[in-house]
UniProtKB/Swiss-Prot annotation:
UniProt xrefs under PROSITE patterns: GATB
Subunit structure: Heterotrimer of A, B and C subunits.
UniProt entry tagged with the keyword Protein biosynthesis: yes
Record SUPFAM superfamilies: GatB/YqeY motif, Glutamine synthetase/guanido kinase
Keyword DNA damage appears in the UniProt entry: no
Protein name in the entry: Aspartyl/glutamyl-tRNA(Asn/Gln) amidotransferase subunit B
Record family assignment: Belongs to the GatB/GatE family. GatB subfamily.
Species of provenance: Streptococcus mutans serotype c (strain ATCC 700610 / UA159)
Gene Ontology process terms (BP): glutaminyl-tRNAGln biosynthesis via transamidation; translation
Coiled coil: none
Keywords of this entry: ATP-binding, Ligase, Nucleotide-binding, Protein biosynthesis
Amino acid sequence: MNFETIIGLEVHVELKTNSKIFSPAPAHFGEDPNANTNIVDWSFPGVLPVMNKGVIDYGIKAALALNMDIHQRMHFDRKNYFYPDNPKAYQISQFDEPIGYNGWIEIELEDGSTKKIRIERAHLEEDAGKNTHGADGYSYVDLNRQGVPLIEIVSEADMRSPEEAYAYLTALKEIIQYTGISDVKMEEGSMRVDANISIRPYGQEAFGVKTELKNLNSFNFVRRGLAYEEKRQAEVLRSGGQIQQETRRYDEATGETLLMRVKEGSADYRYFPEPDLPIFEIEDEWIEKVRAELPAFPKERRAKYVNDLGLSAYDAAQLTSSKAISDFFESALAQGADAKAVSNWLQGDVAQYLNTENQTIDQIGLTPENLTEMLQLVADGTISSKIAKKVFVHLAKNGGSAKEYVKSAGLIQISDPAQLLPIIQEVFANNEKALNDYKGGNKNAAKSLVGQIMKATRGQANPQVAQKLLNEELAKLTD
């Protein structure tokens, strides 16, 4: 019996606000335990939540970016559960009236085709704290994360393979990153994924019993966990067993999914309206103000790069995979840089440098202005492409003007025949064997002579001019 896989994803995205959703405590990552807390986060008796308006702004922005309708009458609910990282014994979330609903995004599949994935809802809520279990036998609670604003984005069960789930997450991350509402760094917990998966015989309309997967710490782990789980469920059904509704965790070491607990239903959380927060009315003017702040998204930019700039689809995809890179590219174009030249540098030397130094493009000294200046120096023959690599490293480390660095470091390319001809004659005098080989008919010997010219000028000779002059001088010797 063959089965069809049904997948839906729940993605938690931490919103990049300065303060928390209901308290003035900072919402920054990486501080000492419990440094970013106050009496609201600790749930001291009598304290009340105060809504952070910026969180609603970001919620509206996310909903618009995901083609969602917006609940203009918005309220919060209590989700009741007891756990040490949740001092109130309930989480303030949204249940029946999320800020966004009925949305969709388009994903690109491996064969180049596209598919629309529907999004059921996007709701705002507060994050929980973090428990750490020490080697000393004690458990520790860090409430820095308690109250950090989240938006949970719940897809419909429209994905039919782990590969489609991977493509959905990639597209969703790009869109959220472009809005600027989150840095979507899975390694810091600002983007977390839970996956729901079931299988059913082909032709059956009813969904099978689903399992939820957790501990999916990268998109690749999502893909691998889903692939294992669809295989496990198929083996259970083929052997006559039944799938249980449960929560399982992905084991990165073994590639398997392991039982965590029997899955709770929403009734287990005893949702009811949050009495300490008012109902919020989101006016049309508010929505339109946020809409005006939306950037051009990756799909639009890719189309522009291919259709207007003549770049390949591959180059366009690489340039738009990061908003910072795409913004840098567009700023360089605004400075007058050649699109293909900037694209080549961003995907080549710049990408390699960022990877080696573990930095982002906004953390280094290279700017659209000094990169454009450097490319112009190459285009007008002031420096060679080889020297440009040295100039780039200097700019990345130190910033500043490419033109001033080239001048102060003595890197200006030698293009004057009056300077190059004596050097060529000196190379002839010091390389008699290569010269005689050339005279004897070995034309490849000229390559070593070019190399010697570049060595003698420490790479500053204009390769085209040097080659032309060399050919002319060699022709005189063989006439």
